[in-house]
């Protein structure tokens, strides 16, 4: 008789046992395996009372600013403002570079969007130290979209480029917001490290190629070919003779200073943490602007400069043209989807990296909602899509940031710099801005190269092949195609892994012993066994099938195929082209250990019924072991128990089958 605790664990799930109408076995002889407490393979469910959160707690959970802002300590204000100043010094030059060298739009739009978006992000995020802004990958996608419109028309006005940038940010924000509301944050599992390395390698190469014309100062020549990176690379190689030597020298000096300062700060940051907050990029640009104005580099040496920067107050509006709105949206939809995906992935990477240091719990759905709000806010000012960046976040933390106020301070300082400091940058050479972008590309390429060398050292050739396939596809057909190609490979890998059966078999080997054979693994039974071997004849003709997972339409078909091969060839992985040397009649007993079958769908149920029926028709004795009560109820309802001989063939453990068959299975 089961104990009260066992009856409590069972609850209403086993009520069918008391009310069953089958006469295959008397009620008092029902086996004890139907008690969840006695099934060693089933986890006991803890009876933990759940407290429903109040309305105020729910509101504070979904809008964290209502919780942290009233509890903000003024002792942190100095550290947050200093950190915001350091991050702003990093964000302003990057925004200028993206606006001028990537998109060709006035910097006022990019800077305003870069300031407004993070403020909205702070209202919803639960990560206090994350810093967000525009990233190179999304700028690259938008630049490709603008260039495709250039190819389809004679020219694209600057107003159109501004609207394209804002609309793509709006689409990305809507998608991120909807994904967060519908709880699709689990999709970050689609991003495998291999896909990430392939995308980083591709983005780094395309960044350096796209900045080549400005970096070398090509004069009198403009690229008008296709949007494929390989064609742009060939254009650069063919026109190297037209490069401005002074522009090239200045670009090389700038990129050397930027990379040198970054490496120096990286080496000294452990000993002097505050060194990270030094705005080296701003200092280099201000120095270049001063020297350019003093020696008149534009007139004397032909070095292009940024020119006058208009600073006007922008009002929020939807980034849509007056005519052909639907066609305009259609042309931007695919790029918007890609940008939303990249924004989410970049943010998750940064948040996870920071969470390891701060022990914060990451909630992907909340980050999606925060990103959606930030990108929608940025798009209303025709700004770029923004996302979390690891470099920017690291600078924020190393500068002493304590709360989300650091991000708000950064946004306020960017707005102040936009309206009061921008005229200082009017004489900055554009090649220096391009050098900043190229230095980011070099940094990404170096990170990807380090990971690739690690994979090559451990000889993971399959993953290396995927990385270089993504990079090759991107170079040949563009970044969007490369990302789609990489995602397709990842999805196929996930599907293959999720549908791969973990079912184990046990049958006599050639030396007369019995061993478990994992369906996926190489086994000692892979060689052909001589059917006349006396060891096989003397071995017990018993097949044990352990199923450690729920049965559904995908893995049950593999179960049928593996059983068929095992019956014919002695091993479930034997090639079907071999000559069969066994028959199903050679098996006397089949034991299905349903240790992990907590559920079964209709397709798997009918397929499993066919398997049992075939064994019964060939007079093979079938036993079921460790059945879950719910699955047992389904089997009884659909006649599977009557098919195998009733409850006498259902046991709670392998030991019971040992006693019934008068053998020792040794499982």
From Swiss-Prot:
The yes or no answer to whether the keyword Ribosomal protein is present is no
Keyword Magnesium recorded: no
- Cell compartment(s), UniProt: Endoplasmic reticulum membrane
Q: Where is this region: Disordered?
A: 1-27
Q: Boundaries of each STAS domain copy?
A: 532-657
Gene Ontology terms, cellular component aspect?
Answer: endoplasmic reticulum; endoplasmic reticulum membrane; fungal-type vacuole membrane; plasma membrane
* Spans traversing the lipid bilayer: 77-97, 102-122, 162-182, 198-218, 240-260, 275-295, 301-321, 336-356, 368-388, 405-425, 433-453, 465-485
Q: How does it sit in the membrane?
A: Multi-pass membrane protein
Q: Which Pfam families match?
A: STAS, Sulfate_transp
Q: Which InterPro entries match?
A: SLC26A/SulP_dom, SLC26A/SulP_fam, STAS_dom, STAS_dom_sf
Q: Which UniProt keywords apply?
A: Endoplasmic reticulum, Membrane, Transmembrane, Transmembrane helix, Transport
Q: Outline what the protein does.
A: Possible sulfate transporter.
Name of the protein in its database record: Probable sulfate permease C320.05
Name its species: Schizosaccharomyces pombe (strain 972 / ATCC 24843)
Offer an example of a GO molecular function term for this protein: sulfate transmembrane transporter activity
**Polar residues: bias regions:** 16-25
Would you identify the family this protein belongs to, as annotated?
A: Belongs to the SLC26A/SulP transporter (TC 2.A.53) family.
**CDD domains given in the database record:** STAS_SulP_like_sulfate_transporter (cd07042)
């Amino acid at each position: 008789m089961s104990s009260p605790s066992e009856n409590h664990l069972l609850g209403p799930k086993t009520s069918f046992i008391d009310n069953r109408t089958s006469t295959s076995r008397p009620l008092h002889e029902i086996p004890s395996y139907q008690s969840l407490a006695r099934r060693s393979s089933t986890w006991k469910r803890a009876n933990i009372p759940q407290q429903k959160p109040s309305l105020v707690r729910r509101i504070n959970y979904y809008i964290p600013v209502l919780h942290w802002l009233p509890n903000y300590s003024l002792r942190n204000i100095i550290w947050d403002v200093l950190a915001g100043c350091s991050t702003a010094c990093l964000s302003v030059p990057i925004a200028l570079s993206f606006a001028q060298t990537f998109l060709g739009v006035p910097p006022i739009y990019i800077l305003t969007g870069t300031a407004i978006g993070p403020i909205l992000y702070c209202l919803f995020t639960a990560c206090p130290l994350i810093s967000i802004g525009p990233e190179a990958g999304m700028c690259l996608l938008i630049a490709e979209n603008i260039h495709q419109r250039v190819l389809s028309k004679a020219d694209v006005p600057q107003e159109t480029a501004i609207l394209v940038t804002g609309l793509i940010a709006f689409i990305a924000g809507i998608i991120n917001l909807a994904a967060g509301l519908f709880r699709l944050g689990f999709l970050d599992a689609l991003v495998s490290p291999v896909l990430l390395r392939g995308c980083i390698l591709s983005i780094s190469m395309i960044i350096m190629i796209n900045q080549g014309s400005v970096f070398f100062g090509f004069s009198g020549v403009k690229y008008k070919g296709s949007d494929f990176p390989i064609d742009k690379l060939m254009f650069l190689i063919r026109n190297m003779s037209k490069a401005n030597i002074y522009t090239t020298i200045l670009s090389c000096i700038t990129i050397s200073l930027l990379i040198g300062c970054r490496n120096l700060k990286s080496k000294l940051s452990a000993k002097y943490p505050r060194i990270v907050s030094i705005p080296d990029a701003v200092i280099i640009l201000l120095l270049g602007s001063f020297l350019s104005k003093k020696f008149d580099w534009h007139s004397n040496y032909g070095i292009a400069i940024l020119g006058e920067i208009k600073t006007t107050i922008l009002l929020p509006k939807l980034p849509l043209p007056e005519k052909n709105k639907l066609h305009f949206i259609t042309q931007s939809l695919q790029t918007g989807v890609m940008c939303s995906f990249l924004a989410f992935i970049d943010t998750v990477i940064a948040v996870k990296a920071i969470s390891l240091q701060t022990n914060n719990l990451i909630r992907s759905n909340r980050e999606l909602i925060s990103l959606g709000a930030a990108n929608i806010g940025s798009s209303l000012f025709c700004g770029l899509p923004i996302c979390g960046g690891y470099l920017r976040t690291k600078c924020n933390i190393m500068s002493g940031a304590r709360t989300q106020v650091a991000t708000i301070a950064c946004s306020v300082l960017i707005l102040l710099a936009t309206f009061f400091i921008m005229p200082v940058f009017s004489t900055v050479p554009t090649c220096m801005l391009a050098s900043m972008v190229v230095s980011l590309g070099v940094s990404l390429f170096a990170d990807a190269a380090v990971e690739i060398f690690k994979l090559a050292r451990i000889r993971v050739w399959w993953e290396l092949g995927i990385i270089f396939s993504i990079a090759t596809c991107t170079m040949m057909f563009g970044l969007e195609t490369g990302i789609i190609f990489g995602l397709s490979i990842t999805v196929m890998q996930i599907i293959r892994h999720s549908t791969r059966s973990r079912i184990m078999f046990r049958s006599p080997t050639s030396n007369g012993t019995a061993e478990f054979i994992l369906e996926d693994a190489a086994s000692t039974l892979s060689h052909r066994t001589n059917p006349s071997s006396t060891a096989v004849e003397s071995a017990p003709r018993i097949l044990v099938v352990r199923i450690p997972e729920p049965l559904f339409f995908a893995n049950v078909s593999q179960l049928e195929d593996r059983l068929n091969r095992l019956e014919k060839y002695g091993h479930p992985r034997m090639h079907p082209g071999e000559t069969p040397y066994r028959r199903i009649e050679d098996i006397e007993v089949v034991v299905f250990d349903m240790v992990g079958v907590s559920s079964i769908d209709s397709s798997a149920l009918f397929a499993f019924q066919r398997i049992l029926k075939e064994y019964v028709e060939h007079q093979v004795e079938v036993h079921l072991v460790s059945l879950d009560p719910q699955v047992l109820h389904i089997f009884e309802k659909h006649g599977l128990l009557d098919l195998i001989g009733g409850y006498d063939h259902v046991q709670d453990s392998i030991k019971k089958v040992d006693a019934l068959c008068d053998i020792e299975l040794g499982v």
